[in-house]
Amino acid sequence: MNYYKESYYTNRELSWLDFNYRVLDEARDKDNPLLERVRFLGITQSNLDEFFTVRVASLRKLMSVNYTKPDPAGLTAADQVSAISDKAHEMVKRQYNTLNRSLLPLLEQHAIHLLSMADLNEEQHAFVKNYFDDELYPALTPMADDSSRPFPFIGNNTLNIALRIYKNGDKKDRKFATVQVPDVFPRVVVLPGAPNQFILIEEIIKAFVGSLFINYTVKETSCYRVMRDLDLDVAEEDTSDLLKEVQKQLKMRERGKVMRLEVEKSMSKHQRTRLAKALGINESALYVINGPLNLTFLSKLVKAVQGHEDLNYPKYHAYYPAKYRERSIFDLIKDHDILMQYPYDDFKPVVDFIHEAAEDEDVLAIKMTLYRVSADSPIIKYLGQAAQNGKQVTVLVEVKARFDEENNVHWAKKLEEMGCHVIYGLIGLKTHCKLALVVRRENEGIKRYMHMGTGNYNDVTAHFYTDMGLFTADTDMGIDASNIFNMLSGYSEPPYFHKLHISPDGIRDFINEKLDDEIAIAKAGQPAVVKMKMNSLSDPQIISKLYEASHAGVKIQLIIRGICCLRTGIKGISDNIEVHSIIGRLLEHSRIYYFSNDGEPQIYLSSADMMTRNLNRRVELLFPLLQPEISHRAMTIFETMWADTVKTRILQPDNTYARVDGRGLEVLDSQAEFIREAEQAVKADHGDTTPTSNAHQFIPMMSPKNEPDASDLDREDD
């Protein structure tokens, strides 16, 4: 049977836009706290920005070389760009309808005001005038566009003001100028007087920008913003120094082609046409915005609000068992494997694992992969400390991790300075696996301790990405881990692995084998079940194998937060497949793979999604949960999420997503349930209601910075 028909597949890019619509739904959800709804709206903007600078940019490159091969859904690059444009324009309209018709009026009901210049009282007007004169004016640079001064370069994601001016006494002599809004100043300006009154910096500049043009009159002012191609193109095979090549490409990336132009609705048609021509874009790439450009400022607005704790998610305490503070982490791991579920379990034991290894005299070596780390990473600190304490420390820092290249280049150099052996990544592959190995001398001989995870070693994103990690001292897994690091650092090619599976190729082969096993079980008339949780499913071969399993009678449950190119409800093809997507307070990021295995279930965690890039072009890790209590907990986590009736959307046969019809069902928000369980564990551990672990105000779907906000995004772990 042919499982590759175009009608069986959804285009990857359009599926991603559907995901961002689900995030936008959270901004429109009246059951969410108001300030969290505002945050969600900012997140949709940052998500959309990266989508254009990477995915749309990639499609336009294909168009530029006349690449016409269709994707599995039958769409060429040109077809996709056209469909994206239609869907994205509609999304932008919905974003600003949500802002203007819902969120801003609701904020005003709570005495939180985003004001215009016309709204300011006398005191506030004097304040912004002084602010402009004393702070902003010296930093502003007017740029003319005429025969002797060509149109200036407009940087990616910078906010700019287009002006139409004429010389005093000569209204016919109209000229164009542009002024960049300096990003060294806060965009959200707190006004004096009543609390929670704000104005955007561009409104102040537009009001007083005329002082930059002496003997000229300003006829029109309007903001605009461009998004450029930021897709890094590193010629790895042709470079002898990967680090230098990445740094070179980072500089070149700043001048990528324009993918999208946003202009204020108030901008005249004449100005729009002039800008579009100067920037080299067509009408489909022009977005007319009914409100402030670049909604990522909303996270800054939320942070600036004083009081109103009731308009945020309530804080809670991650679980950090007392025994972790009382005993050596190595003794705990030696006793039994430890499964962690972040952020409900505190991430601190992972940091402690490296910290204790750095100080333990019996530790001989530490080996670790780093993909995205925070801007002030304690793990980096302790790895350097370990090297300075005479231990052999080897760290693979993936310098090609998208939009973290500069941060990772910085840390790679820092680790080298501290005495660590640093690997910058492998040619042609990104190392995306999350693996830490500690080699320790004990009375019984050399012992290996490991941490393997589904998410990054990032102490910041661990607060709002849901991930899982395993501590183990399993001997076979330890041998496998050593072989993986030997492969990453040298020329080793292990003939096989005992219990771990890696990509490229290995994870694909393993998943196919397990699905074939379930197909055989179903054909033998026995119950066969597959359960998977991942961020995205787009690989055509894996999807076709899932269709084959469904056709054979295997019951398949998929929890997929983001991209899903598989279609449900196709008669005889996907009748036995159900797909859920959970979008909530925290970003679902863990990967779980369950196979019923003829009554002896097998459960695995992984760093890999079922995407072609993860299976073919990444070094990924898939590892088993072997101890019964550990595997049972993992499946309880999956089942709780599957039973979610609050934040789940179910993929429909028409390719839309619908919320669960909760009539007659228990109301269950899986993330809220995990939070409740964590709080109960904290209280039970301390014997009172005063937790000792740090409380967290979690922010969903943002990237690894020490000050996460909606200018960052869910990067789909490229």
Curated annotation (Swiss-Prot):
UniProt xrefs under PANTHER family: POLYPHOSPHATE KINASE
Superkingdom: Bacteria
Family assignment from sequence similarity: Belongs to the polyphosphate kinase 1 (PPK1) family.
GO molecular function terms attached to this record: ATP binding; metal ion binding; polyphosphate kinase activity
Reported cofactor(s): Mg(2+)
Chain segments carrying region Disordered: 683-718
Pfam families: PP_kinase, PP_kinase_C, PP_kinase_C_1, PP_kinase_N
General function of this protein: Catalyzes the reversible transfer of the terminal phosphate of ATP to form a long-chain polyphosphate (polyP).
Catalysed conversion reaction: [phosphate](n) + ATP = [phosphate](n+1) + ADP
Modifications made to the protein after synthesis: An intermediate of this reaction is the autophosphorylated ppk in which a phosphate is covalently linked to a histidine residue through a N-P bond.
One GO BP annotation of this record: polyphosphate biosynthetic process
Gene Ontology CC: polyphosphate kinase complex
Binding positions (ATP): 47, 465, 561, 589
Cystines in this chain: none
Keywords, comma-separated and alphabetical: ATP-binding, Kinase, Magnesium, Metal-binding, Nucleotide-binding, Phosphoprotein, Transferase
Residue positions of the active site: 432
Compositionally biased intervals (Acidic residues): 709-718
Annotated EC: 2.7.4.1
Binding site for Mg(2+): 372, 402
Protein name: Polyphosphate kinase
